[in-house]
Amino acid sequence: MEFKTRFLQDPRQSFFLFGPRGTGKSTWMKNTLENAIYIDLLDAEVFRAYSSRPERLKEVAEAQKPGTTIVLDEIQKQPQLLDVVHQLMESHTGCRFILSGSSARKLKRSGVDLLAGRAAVKTMHPFMAAELGENFSLEEALGIGTVPLIVDSPNPKEAIKAYAALYLKEEVQMEGLVRNIGAFSRFLESISFSHGAALNISDVARDCQVERKTVEGYVSILEDLLLGFRIPVFSRRAKRRLSSHCKFYYFDSGVFRSLRPAGPIDAHQEMEGAALEGLVAQHLRAWNAYGNGLCKLFFWRTKSGNEVDFVIYGQDTFCAIEVKNTANIHAKMLRGLLTFREDYPEAQPCLLYRGKEHLKIKNVLCLPVEEFLKNLKPLNPLRGDMGSKPTYG
C-alpha cells in the first residue's frame, strides 16, 4: 500500500504521539523515522518481555549510539515503562524517545505525568483533504470519513461499521473503562444526535436511562480516547447573552455516520448536514494541530438563536465560519455571520456551501466547501485559504 505523506512534522525531540486507532501513527513512524529502534507493545512476545522486565528498555537504550531514536508503540499497554524512559532522559543517554498510543487515559490513571513535560505532545488526525490530494472526494468523506484505516480498506463501508465495535471491545471493554458496556453502547448512539449540536448532558442521560454523572464520565472517556471533542462558546467581550452549552463532535464524519441511526423517519439531509459540519471541524482541528497550535476553536450562539458554527481565534487569526449543506445561498443563511460581525468587526466572516462559485454577499465571502478543504494546509494562514476572486451578489 502506497504511503501517503502526512502533514505531521517530526519535532526532532522526544515526544508523545497520540491519535485514535487507525489514524496512521504506526505507518507514519515506520516511514518517517529512519533507523529507529521500534518496540511494538501490541506484539504478544514483546509485551511479555517488557512486562516482566521493564528494565530491559534501559539495556536496549544503553547499547545504542547517541542520537538513536527509540519508538515505543502503544505505550499505554505498559505505562510503567515511562518511569524507565524518564530515568534514561535524566541520565542523558543521548537517545530520543517517541511514545505512541491511542489514548493518554490509562497513563493518567496509572499516575504518570507524561514525563513531567520533558516530551512534546503531538496528535495524529484523520486524513486532511490536502493529504489525499486528487483522491479526496467530498461525497466519500461524508459517508465513510477520512480515517486512514477505513479509507485504505478494500471494503471501506464494512470497515467503518466494524470500527466502533473495535473500540468497544479493545479500548473500553478490555481496559475496564465502563461497568455497563450495554449502557455505553446506547450512549454512543444517543450522543450521535448531538454531533454538531449543543450538548445537553441531562437529555442524553434521560435517553440512555442512566445518571447524569455517568454520561459525564462517558463523554470524558470519548475525549480521552480521542473519539470525540467539545468546543466552547466564544465569549470574549460578549455583548449579548450567550448559550452556556458546548458543542460536541465525533472525531470523524464517517464514525459519526456509522453510529447515527438511519431509518425511514430519519432525515437524510439533517444527517448529511451534521456530517459536513463535523468534517470541517475535524479539518480545522488538524490544521491547527499540525501547524503552530496557537489558535483555539469555538462556536458562537446567542440566547436569541443567532449562531456561527466556528470561530477560530489566535494571535493573528480571527475568523467566523458558517457551514451550509446546500448549493444555493439565501440571505437568511448569513444572519448569524452578520450579527457576529456587528459585535466583532475585526473578524473575517466566511460561509462554506456545496455550490461551485466564489461569491461575496453583503461583504461575506462564500466559498465551495470542497475547495476550502482541499486548500486547507498547516501553517498557511486561514485567511489565505479564503482568498479568491469573488462574484459579487
Predicted regions and their residues:
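Hydrophobic positions on the alpha1 helix immediately C-terminal to the Walker A/P-loop
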Residues: W28
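Short glycine-rich substrate-engagement loop in P-loop NTPases that contacts/grips substrate
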Residues: I39-T68
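Accessory nucleic acid-recognition modules appended to NTPase machines
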Residues: E158-F318
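Hydrophobic anchor at the beta1->P-loop junction of P-loop NTPases
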Residues: L17
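Conserved lysine of the Walker
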Residues: K25
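Short regulatory helix/loop adjacent to the ATP-binding pocket of P-loop NTPases
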Residues: R105-A120, F136
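Pre-Walker A adenine-sensing motif
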Residues: M1-Q13
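Conserved catalytic/switch belt of AAA+ P-loop NTPases
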Residues: L82-R105, D113
